[in-house]
């Protein structure tokens, strides 16, 4: 005698709608000031996780790796070698 065990239908039928539908909100990471822009002391320049961009001259790094300006000045995004980036703030000269 030949015994066949065939299954034609799904054992669970479409019971996933309440298990789907989760998505986390965006964290709003990235550059907050552009290259060449004037910033005041304490301004957030770059929000990040880890050190995608490193702090340069007159730039501090917060506990969550956020980069902020230590002085008033002009923002400059620079490259360090092939694969590292740095952001610095240079003071504005007082000639006018």
From Swiss-Prot:
It comes from the Bacteria. One of its GO terms (molecular function) is structural constituent of ribosome. It holds the Pfam family Ribosomal_L27. Residues 1-9 form a propeptide. One of its GO terms (biological process) is translation. Coiled coil: none annotated. Belongs to the bacterial ribosomal protein bL27 family. NCBIfam families: L27. This is Large ribosomal subunit protein bL27.
């Amino acid at each position: 005698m030949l015994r066949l065990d065939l299954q034609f239908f799904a054992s669970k039928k479409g019971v996933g709608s309440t298990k789907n539908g989760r998505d986390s909100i965006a964290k709003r990471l990235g550059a907050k000031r552009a290259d060449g822009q004037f910033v005041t002391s304490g301004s957030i320049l770059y929000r990040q996780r880890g050190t995608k961009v490193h702090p340069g001259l007159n730039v501090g790094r917060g506990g969550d790796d956020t980069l902020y300006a230590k002085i008033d000045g002009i923002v400059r995004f620079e490259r360090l070698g092939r694969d590292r980036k740095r952001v610095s703030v240079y003071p504005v000269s007082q000639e006018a």
